[in-house]
């Protein structure tokens, strides 16, 4: 008897290694995945422009490397309408400098990226002077026009990007975080549009081969009571993949497989740390090569040791530990080019 709906995912033919560089763009769910990559030193760049939610703003971040900052002033603060609120400041010069620095960071990350992970958050957009903004920065609502993107708009914005960057593997996801401020029904319609757009972007690609997924190196410990993955050979898989684009079903995993409020944070909207960990495990078992799994285990253990709280730094034992840690770090930097 099965007491849960399992999302079956076939392992990707495009395996990620430590020779790759990953660029993550999109909603705060992509930030959560970036934090997981930090813990195993997987080469990546996460959201140089800050958190972006709608598909057009994410596409614009890739396409327009020479755009103007588009700065507005409100209540003593300067804001860039193409950036997250973390770029806002009382000093306009600092805002412009931060925007320019993020543009350079984006250009460098895009140039060296071999894998690009895109997380769509919402199909709702706000327009200021007939242009889609990335963030409203709590400006008066009367200054904006709110509307919902269509599937064709999203596809039209992304097809040229996929065609231009054929040397990179794009992984699309839809954020499982519900935008309840839009209304629950409106959120569902929004997510449906995002899912259909991703379906259209991956439709012409052949399905990925069915193989037994590798076990995640992160199972056990606090996560041992989470639902387990099931062999993908027994059921249809949600993985859609061609040489340059694939879809990872983070949305379906959280809403269907983890369909319980114990997997949500206190706000009942964001996934809990346990849910994020589980989705990360599923991502790892889908996209990481066997060698990468071993390397991740090695580097994750080092990360834990490096962030271990030392109670008595002046003790001989602590000094030996720090000396061994420094030697191990030097060795790993050489091995993995960290």
Question: Where on the chain are the PLM-derived regions?
Answer:
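Surface-exposed cleft-lining segments at the edges of enzyme active sites
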Residues: 88-100, 134-158, 178-186
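Active-site segments of SGNH/GDSL-like serine hydrolases
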Residues: 121-123, 163-188, 249-253, 299-306
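Short amphipathic alpha-helices and their capping/turn segments at secondary-structure boundaries
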Residues: 98-116, 158-164, 201
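A short mid-domain helix/strand-loop element embedded in enzyme catalytic domains
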Residues: 118-140, 169-171
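Conserved catalytic region of serine esterases and O-acyltransferases that act on ester linkages
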Residues: 266-267, 277, 282-338
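Extracellular serine-dependent O-acyl
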Residues: 192-204, 245-260, 282, 296-298
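Basic, amphipathic N-terminal segments that precede the first structured/catalytic domain
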Residues: 2-111, 312, 319, 326, ...
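Glycine-biased, low-complexity coil/linker segments
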Residues: 209-212, 220-221, 239-243
């Amino acid at each position: 008897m099965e007491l849960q709906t399992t999302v079956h995912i076939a392992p990707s033919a495009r395996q990620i290694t430590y020779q790759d560089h990953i660029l993550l763009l999109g909603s705060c769910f992509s930030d959560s995945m970036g934090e997981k990559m930090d813990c195993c030193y997987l080469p990546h760049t996460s959201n140089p422009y800050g958190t972006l939610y709608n598909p057009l703003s994410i596409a614009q971040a890739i396409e327009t490397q020479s755009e103007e900052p588009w700065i507005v002033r409100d209540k003593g603060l300067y804001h860039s309408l193409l950036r997250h609120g973390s770029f806002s400041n009382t000093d306009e010069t600092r805002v412009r400098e931060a925007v320019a620095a993020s543009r350079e960071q984006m250009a460098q990350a895009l140039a060296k990226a071999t894998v690009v992970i895109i997380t769509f958050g919402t199909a709702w957009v706000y327009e200021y002077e007939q242009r889609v903004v990335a963030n409203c920065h709590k400006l008066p609502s009367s200054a904006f026009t709110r509307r919902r993107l269509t599937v064709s708009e999203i596809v039209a914005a992304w097809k040229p990007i996929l065609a231009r960057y054929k040397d990179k593997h794009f992984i699309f996801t839809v954020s499982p975080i519900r935008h309840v401020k839009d209304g629950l029904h409106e959120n569902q319609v929004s997510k449906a549009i995002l899912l259909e757009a991703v379906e259209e972007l991956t439709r012409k690609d052949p399905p990925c081969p069915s193989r037994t997924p590798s076990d995640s190196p992160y199972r056990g410990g606090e996560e041992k009571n989470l639902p387990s993955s099931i062999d993908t050979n027994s059921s249809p898989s949600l993985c859609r993949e061609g040489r340059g684009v694939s879809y990872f079903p983070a949305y379906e995993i959280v809403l269907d497989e983890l369909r319980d409020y114990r997997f949500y944070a206190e706000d009942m909207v964001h996934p809990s740390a346990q849910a994020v960990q589980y989705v990360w495990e599923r991502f790892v078992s889908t996209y990481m090569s066997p060698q990468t799994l071993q390397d991740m285990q090695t580097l994750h253990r080092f990360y834990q040791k490096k962030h271990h709280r030392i109670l008595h730094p002046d003790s001989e034992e602590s000094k030996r530990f720090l000396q061994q840690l420094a030697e191990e770090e030097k060795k790993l930097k050489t091995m993995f080019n960290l």
